[in-house]
Amino acid sequence: MDLASRKIVGWSMSERMKADLVCEALKSAYWRRKPAAGLIMHSDRGSQYAGESHRQLIKDYRMIQSMSTRGNCWDNAAMESFFKTLKVERVHQLRYQTRAQAKLDIVNWIEGFYNQRRMHSSIGYQTPVDAERSLMAA
């Protein structure tokens, strides 16, 4: 997530939460955005984020790693809020027949609804795409 616009810029899905999952999500975000060196990559303190493969990828991309304070859920509140929204507004509303169907639907929801049409109070009741445009124009 781009914290300034709340736009979801990279993701990956898997049956298990492993280091390669978060590395794939970071690669997705990196290649879509191609950020300048020094971008802060924030996460919780999960073992996948603290692992060598993820730390090395952050170093290779010349990013700065930031991790939540131990026991402080507020440090990663924006992502926690996104996952709650995804579950409540989409995933728990449907019954998927296959994992492939679920993945396709979730990607379509992120790209077609969440980033494009869902307004957020934290960015002045704009959509993430509109907030990003406003930030780029400033």
Feature map (PLM): residue ranges:
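Charged DNA-binding/catalytic regions of mobile-element recombinases
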Residues: 1-138
